[in-house]
Amino acid sequence: KRRARKEERREKFLVVISPNLTNPYYVMLLQGIESRAKEQGFGLFVCNTQRDLKMEERYLKMMWSLRPLGIIYTCNPSHCFMGMVEELASHIPVAVVNNQNEKLNVDAVELDNSKLGRMMARHLLELGHRKVAYVAPPLTTRQKQRSKRVEGFLKEFGEAGLKDQVIIKAAKEEMDQNIAHIDSEYKIGYELTKELLAETRDVTAIVGLNDMIAFGVLDALHEAKLKVPGDVSVMGCDNTLFARMHKVSLTTIEHFVIFKGRDACDIIMKKITSHNEKYSEIEPISTYHVEYEPKLIVRGTTSYPK
């Protein structure tokens, strides 16, 4: 009885662990989580790791004393902490919005990044683009979801016999070790595109790993007096709010980010309910995996090459 009363007195809150809050993608995920949590009468604590391993470890250790009713990771946990996350998941409901190819024994709302990369490549190939560039943040082992997206893109071009026609421009690893500024990813797109244009003007299309990078690409091209899509086509990924604005009208990939946030929260709610309604004193064990089919959104920044 005492234990039951203690459980009843626990504050109804969830913890969201996010790698940054500067990219609208994570803000959209958070919006989806928060809207569903609010409907269910839950509050949220947000832990921003800033892709710092020490910060991530510190937050994970804090969970034992905070004792939230659930934890949502808005990206894959760092590899060195996957064991800690699985241990937490055996005591507290945990859901991860992750890259489908990662091996993690917890509930997940999955994203097949390789498929996203293939979709981006297929769109450009169908338009007739043959010489293209891909602009990305650091492609490190810690950030496998980025590499998977690039790999999918290269695979599609490879199957068309054009893999050697793709230029990969990735930021240096130090970028992930610095605290992200509000314009960090935009700057990656802007600076790497300027570098690219100094090296070659042969490319007919430039892809940003995400929309924020693509915005930087657009500004660098505008500064170089190159027309989009007349001279160079540009493509992003995530279908963030800014991509939809009339002046930008960015071709991108929609993978239903807000819905994923809501689904991650729903998974936690189901786990909390099943924990509270034990069947013959045996807690049911279930694993949830949700995946959305991504959709190409063609707008005004991609067209046939000259």
Annotate the PLM regions.
Residues K194-K306:
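Flexible loop/turn connectors
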Residues K1-R10, K306:
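N-terminal helix-turn-helix DNA-binding module of bacterial transcription factors
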Residues E8-R122, E126, A198-R201:
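Alpha-helical recognition/docking segments in bacterial nutrient-uptake
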